[in-house]
Amino acid sequence: MINISGYDGFTGHMDQRAHNVTAKAGMHGLTKAIAREYGVFGITSNTVAPGAIATKRDPAQYKHVNVEHVLARLAIKHPGEAEDVAEACLYLAADSGKYVTGQVIHVNGGEFMF
């Protein structure tokens, strides 16, 4: 099982999005619970948590975002691409990821590190 979430569930968010933070934290917990409960059957459960990913979005929705401020927080000084997230999912779904379970894989250019 591969969930797509985000890191707000670990850090909170400042834009009155408690509902979003709660849902993401719940997703992280579900990922771990499924990994424990169903690992005995060979089922893996992980979450991929994207960060700043360049996608085709409605520009009006993100007009308040200061791109330079976002990029300054990244260890890798450019946004990721949708393919970066897809590659993480492919790794988890392939045989190469068969021993990875209960994890949150952060694809965020080093913005958030554990």
Predicted regions and their residues:
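Conserved SDR Rossmann-fold cofactor-binding beta-strand/turn motif
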Residues: T44-A54, A93, H106-N108
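Short, small/polar-rich loop/turn modules that mediate ligand/substrate recognition or access, typified
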Residues: G39, T44, V100-G102
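Short alpha-helix in the Rossmann-fold core of NAD(P)-dependent oxidoreductases
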Residues: A23-K24, N46, K77-H78
